[in-house]
Amino acid sequence: QRAFDKAVQNMNSDEVTDVKYHTLPNLELKNIIVDHSVVSGIFDRQNTRIATEFSENQQERYATGRIESNIELQQFLSKAKSTVNHMVQQFQMKQAADADRRTNITKTGVLDTTSMINYRWSEDIFLKNESHTDGKNHGIVMFLDWSGSMSNILKDTVEQLLILTEFCNKANVPFEVYAFSSNRYYPTLEKFTDRYCDEYKDAVKALEIDASQYTYVNEDTDVTPHKFQLYNFLSSRMTTKEYKVALQNFWGLSGAVSNYGGRVYYPNCLDLGCTPLNEAIVASFDIVPEFQRQNGIQIV
């Protein structure tokens, strides 16, 4: 026993600090989420700047890149169509089977005048009541890592994500797509073409003071998360036209910022940044329940 106790003692570390427990601050989602309507405006203003401020060669390069990107997108959607249709078919079959399991048929005790003529050889002469217990509605909230470490696999990841959004659209399943990034969105800084210049960095520091993302309830225990942004690239709240345009923008952007490459110019704020994964998880604690409430969903 003494030898065991000594061995345990030798395993102790004098450098270990005390365990500290922390709490989470309240999130100001209005300063974190960039809604799909705002993202659309970012792309629109970028296109306006390209048309008015870029050289003819740059404009031609951009136009060609957009055409090639859109063609590639259509080729991908055509290729994925059979997969999406199969997913929808399986989903609907499962729904039908689930509805059948939830169906309960009972006799009412009220005579069925149509079946009464069969009373001599059948006792089944009463009206039946068919009832269905409520099923469960589904919804999907997707969070995409929009960081530099994703550059090698971003295109493949986006392809998988779009298969899910296409499925949701065909199966009428509500969905939201958020990309989490350390790159912040400041409307007044869209004019900058170089986000690494000193003027841009100074402007960001000045704006950081006003764009609070967290409300600290307990200064002694609340952690201090990094500031980040959630870009709502795609949503079931979009109209068919809005979704089509957003899909083209999203596809072109993912190709341009990844190692896959692309000739589509994109806004600075939508470039790949760091990985605020923990912050995105904390934000999901508020986003998912609100998504459930707004859409009347049980399963997310």
What are these regions (language model features)?
Residues 3-300:
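Acidic, glycine-rich A-domain
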